[in-house]
Amino acid sequence: PIHSSAASDVYKRQIQPYGDVPILAAGGIVTGKQMAAAMAMGASGAWCGSVWLTTIESEVEPVIKEKMVAANSSQTVRSRSRTGKHSRQLVTPWTQAWEADSAPEPLPMPLQPMVAEPALQKVNKLAAGGHEGAKDLATYWVGQGVGLMNQSISASDVVQEFKEDFINAFERLNNFVS
């Protein structure tokens, strides 16, 4: 199993040794509050990935966006089923089948995508057409922050929410030292 560390432990180990070198925090940052927390621990900024996947402008299939909006953080898994390398994605019967004891070992990259992607593209096409079994199988890369991504909004609204959350968190922290 792949183990995770608390974000504060990771930031402490990864940021402190570099002194004045700007470091971006990444992983699980889907709100302005989380960005402010990372910066309070020493990061110079944040790299945000998953939060953009449920935006209106995202290329992600609507069926998968719906699954992401409904998901919680425990409904992701690091799996080699898609690329041959560990990547976090939605848990589905597809990922569970590849993780089963009786499953074949995923092929190394670049071979596993040659096996997985044609099948997953077919799954997505069927899911978009309303096929219930395909909807269950459909998966996509997404981080554990998915549990906080509860609606599909525009990218500009994501930026605005980040800004407001960040400012509120910053002001709250500032009040502790004032």
Summary of predicted features, one role per range:
Residues 17-26:
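Short beta-strand/loop segments at the ligand-binding rim of alpha/beta enzyme cores
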Residues 1-7, 11:
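Single conserved hydrophobic/aromatic residue that forms the stacking wall/gate
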Residues 26-32:
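Gly/Ser-rich catalytic serine loop of serine hydrolases
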Residues 16-17, 32-178:
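Alpha/beta catalytic cores of nucleotide-metabolism and tRNA/nucleoside-modifying enzymes
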